[in-house]
Amino acid sequence: MSNTICLKQILAGEVEALEELLKIEEKMGNILLEGDAKALHGLNMQKEEIINTINEAEKQRRGVYTSSLTLKEFILKEKPPAAEELERIRRRLLQLQASLQRQQKINRHLLKHNLRFLEYVLEGLFPQKGVPHYLSSGEVKQKIIASGLLDSNA
């Protein structure tokens, strides 16, 4: 089998894997909005499997395509029918990577927001007693401690 055909198959496999990864990231975004945190674990396991698949495809690609040329440069040297197909796959890979980066950025933002909200709720339930502050005279200045909802002092 020629290197071009083999490269095409490997890249097509990477496209499929990235499409699956994007679907999972979109599901994760919905879960982060809806709050079903238990479902995140299963999706993270699926993501790990897909990432391993992508890494394996990348190793195969390096085995087939050992040139120092970029994929775009390689395509420019190919003959028209094969070059057109490889260019279509290359553009799809770029599109998927951009979509994946955008969705991951959204998910990170949602995750940070959820963690800040959780921290706010926990602070309301279990307020920190604060560290004593010392005045220049050596006396201890205590912060006024608000009672939390579950505080035994409330």
Residue ranges, per PLM feature:
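Short terminal interaction segments
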Residues: 78-154
